[in-house]
From Swiss-Prot:
Domain called GGDEF: residue spans: 428-563
Protein name in the entry: Probable diguanylate cyclase DgcQ
Record's bilayer topology term: Multi-pass membrane protein
Natural source organism: Shigella dysenteriae serotype 1 (strain Sd197)
Keyword terms: Cell inner membrane, Cell membrane, Cellulose biosynthesis, GTP-binding, Magnesium, Membrane, Metal-binding, Nucleotide-binding, Transferase, Transmembrane, Transmembrane helix
Pfam families: CHASE7, GGDEF
Amino acid sequence: MQHETKMENQSWLKKLARRLGPGHIVNLCFIVVLLFSTLLTWREVVVLEDAYISSQRNHLENVANALDKHLQYNVDKLIFLRNGMREALIAPLDFTSLRDAVTEFEQHRDEHAWQIELNRRRTLPVNGVSDALVSEGNLLSRENESLDNEITAALEVGYLLRLAHNSSSMVEQAMYVSRAGFYVSTQPTLFTRNVPTRYYGYVTQPWFIGHSQRENRHRAVRWFTSQPEHASNTEPQVTVSVPVDSNNYWYGVLGMSIPVRTMQQFLRNAIDKNLDGEYQLYDSKLRFLTSSNPDHPTGNIFDPRELAFLAQAMEHDTRGGIRMDSRYVSWERLDHFDGVLVRVHTLSEGVRGDFGSISIALTLLWALFTTMLLISWYVIRRMVSNMYVLQSSLQWQAWHDTLTRLYNRGALFEKARPLAKLCQTHQHPFSVIQVDLDHFKAINDRFGHQAGDRVLSHAAGLISSSLRAQDVAGRVGGEEFCVILPGASLTEAAEVAERIRLKLNEKEMLIAKSTTIRISASLGVSSSEETGDYDFEQLQSLADRRLYLAKQAGRNRVFASDNT
């Protein structure tokens, strides 16, 4: 059983090798090499893409941290001012100038507009409106027992506001706006008549209304953005503000206004070393504020669909990146600003950068390697194909007689032995026909060897056309042929032999110009049915002996037994 299994495995391998062939194996090898080279290149592309994304995030993080530090500085100043205001409300300074300011307030509080100023060089003036105007506002009120303390606290905060406000800061204006009808601002009010307009401009802003106890229950710092009206000459601003409370009473709002243009200038300064990519600042509602590219302010602005896609991505993380068409968009939420900083990197910018150069080089290398691989495949494939054709031709020549195109003696014996063994295994008959052309030497002597060759070729064609599909014929001598008939009984083999004899004898063939001859053959037939012997050489010897009996009996005959 083990021997049979081993033989079956070897037979299966041989069939597979014949089915595939050298050309298919070459194709398979080159496909595997191309596949692995493509996978390695793809892996390098993935690593390169990860490095590119990390680089984009690092650039964005550096700018975001720098912007956050400046904004944090302003928020810290705002918290410091609120703490100072609270202390001043609880324990005001007992200065004569401050008491005089309270007295002056009592004298002018009924006036339409008023201004209290201690020392213009050291502190900021308090600008206010009348009691009547205050009573008209829903959020405004002077029904406060600590109103005098708030007046003095506002003057003290005015001193701190003057110190905190400087030209190097991003803040354009710092102010305290009270619910009691007055305000202190680093931007002076030149004419008293403008105080009511300016005050009501403050108290109607979202950054003031948004700090009511209902709107801002946690009393935290909040950011607001203001977009200019179409008919207004004012520019967009970002305002950070915080409510001022003491003893559960809301006094007013401290705020700082930052023009969007200063943020734009900061972004431009922050990316001087990184020329590629555009930085964009958005508020918490993803409304565009400013860009680091003033020359093309709307070049990379997102449409509503892209903004919705970006907002959906931002819901899951405070930082990240996505691809939009030919752009890579990375974002990071700021810690001290209620908004997000976005970096847009286009495909053209990426191609011009270091990663673009590496990507192009990698693509060219892969294309060059693939081209060389295909050329090598073509050359080797042609070489193997030619060698395979040559091998097949040499093998055919080694197994066949070139004149008759039948098997030669050695090949016939190689074919006969396994066929005889197979028939013996399955108990099928195995027959042999031996054929010899009559008077062939006389034809050679009379008409020449070329005529003899034509006779042999003609006879071989007639013999082949008389056989069954499973029969095998070969040339075993000069004018001798042998036919193997696996599975044919002696009677069937004799019928085949008779058919061969008739075909050979019936047809005339042209030997020379106007010269035709008719050939004949003597045939001997043997079969394993007679003795049970499946030895091919013994059967051939028996058929050969009967062939000579046919010649002795007058030629052009078939002898299938010794007694016929």
